[in-house]
Amino acid sequence: MSELIDVKTILSGTELGPLADNERLKRESKHLRGTIVEDLQDRITGGFTKDNFQLIRFHGMYQQDDRDIRAERAKQKLEPLHNVMLRARMPGGIITPKQWLAIDKFAEEHTSYGSLRLTTRQTFQFHGVLKPNIKLMHQTLNSIGIDSIATAGDVNRNVLCTTNPVESELHQEAYEWAKKISEHLLPKTRAYAEIWLDGEKLETTDEEPILGSNYLPRKFKTTVVIPPQNDVDVHANDLNFIAIADNGKLVGFNVLVGGGLAMTHGDTATYPRKADDFGFVPLKKTLEVAAAVVTTQRDWGNRSNRKNAKTKYTLDRVGSDVFKAEVEKRAGVQFEESRPYELTERGDRIGWVEGIDGKHHLALFIENGRLLDYPGKPLKTGVAEIAKVHQGDFRMTANQNLIVAGVPSEQKDHIEQIARAHGLIDDTHSEQRKNSMACVAFPTCPLAMAEAERFLPEFVTEIEGVLKKHNLPEEDNIIFRVTGCPNGCGRAMLAEIGLVGKAPGRYNFHLGGNRSGTRVPKMYKENITDRQILTEIDHLVGRWAIERNENEGFGDFTIRAGIVDEVKVSKRDFHA
């Protein structure tokens, strides 16, 4: 017990240093209200000022600008073209055709880019929404039963759930838990409704029994996972519930805590980290455990240094066993030994699959998740046309793809015809392309150091050429991911080849992840150009083609061959 008291003393005292300014901001925000309403009325600037720049994140938005034209606007003595990106809250990524048509219409009429972006957080984003349209955006979403509460900021964000329409009953159970967890951990403040939906201003204390008056030290991510699929990448998340079934019925979850991929260039105290397995809990204790993990991180997390504020660093600082014991105490539960499970795949099953209920599901590969009408490939229009006739729902995936789910047999041919006519089914897409992914990066992300989404398609074509040069069959491909900065949205730190942006045209080159997403890769080359990277890939793939063991993946080969050392304990090994 004294150890726990000591931990609390350290974490609530001054030993970690003075509080970060974000803590003042949250404390003074009037429960996330700030002066956002006043900023909305200010037409002199297209942006949000002072603290509101940060506070709008708790409402699901980031202030951005078009970096392609930033310098030109500066020459003309104009401020950057400020706009916001909104990320919707959609636990499990399920959206109805009616909802889809509404967001498609808004993107077309009220965003600068006219696109919808599916993201690794299993939801959609609007990019390029100007200040006069922000309130309309929230009201449009509210009218169709969607919001963006807590999809950014120091809160529990959009809860992911394995997209597995084949095992329909189990998926439905898991999805319902994803929704319950999301609702349970949401902020209780009425600020969102008051500001965006003209909700009645109530005299209320806005008590936050789980998140607390200062909310969490840093962002917090949660998943619900149905083995053997790991499409949500459990080790990228703070809290994971691994579904354990008995005779097809969900009986409980194995709980994994403390994953996360973000780091800071040049700071060896930051690193990607896998989640720790705490053990099994029955269904009835799920919400208590979720709240206990969140409140322990709330109370023990580092509020002095935001670079070390995530759950993964709390576990490494206080000890995983100490953190686990506190969760047990708060939840009133004893973790049982984890039930057996295996994660073997994480790609989406592109094409048609039939569920156990006889319904059909069409997974569409959407490169980098960008739905736009390209010349000869009107992808965005194609999905809208499907939505006009589809009787089931759509499921966004954490791989940035889209599943047309619940298609009856008699409608299958018609849906496929629409998809093919609009380029949504393209038989020329290689398995390598389907297993490659990038975050948004330029021109909209203010944190991007290098290109990602715009860089990936042509670079994948070059990787395809390398694989062909070394006579590798289609099924022998590489999990390849690019992220424009070390914050990790593209989940490159769980790839067999992961590129992390360092500067325009330059990346840190990581090797050694595996196909199932259960190993963190290690830096192989630092700050090199894309041409140098391609040369290295050519050499490494050449070796893999000749020297590999039977069925040995590229990432496994790089470890066995000693090209990079395996990262077993991130704090010790990642920077070693």
From Swiss-Prot:
One of its GO terms (molecular function) is NADP binding. PROSITE patterns: NIR_SIR. Its EC number is 1.8.1.2. It comes from the Bacteria. InterPro entries: CysI, NiRdtase/SiRdtase_haem-b_fer, Nit/Sulf_reduc_fer-like_dom_sf, NO2/SO3_Rdtase_4Fe4S_dom, NO2/SO3_Rdtase_4Fe4S_prot, NO2/SO3_Rdtase_4Fe4S_sf, NO2/SO3_Rdtase_FeS/sirohaem_BS. GO terms for cellular component: sulfite reductase complex (NADPH). Pathway: Sulfur metabolism; hydrogen sulfide biosynthesis; hydrogen sulfide from sulfite (NADPH route): step 1/1. Keywords: 4Fe-4S, Amino-acid biosynthesis, Cysteine biosynthesis, Heme, Iron, Iron-sulfur, Metal-binding, NADP, Oxidoreductase. It catalyses: hydrogen sulfide + 3 NADP(+) + 3 H2O = sulfite + 3 NADPH + 4 H(+). Binds 1 siroheme per subunit. It holds the Pfam family NIR_SIR_ferr. Its cofactor is siroheme; [4Fe-4S] cluster. [4Fe-4S] cluster binds at residues 439, 445, 485, 489. Siroheme binds at residue 489. GO terms for biological process: cysteine biosynthetic process; hydrogen sulfide biosynthetic process; sulfate assimilation. Alpha(8)-beta(8). The alpha component is a flavoprotein, the beta component is a hemoprotein. Belongs to the nitrite and sulfite reductase 4Fe-4S domain family. HAMAP family: CysI. Component of the sulfite reductase complex that catalyzes the 6-electron reduction of sulfite to sulfide. This is one of several activities required for the biosynthesis of L-cysteine from sulfate. NCBIfam families: CysI, PRK13504.1. This is Sulfite reductase [NADPH] hemoprotein beta-component. It comes from Aliivibrio fischeri (strain MJ11).
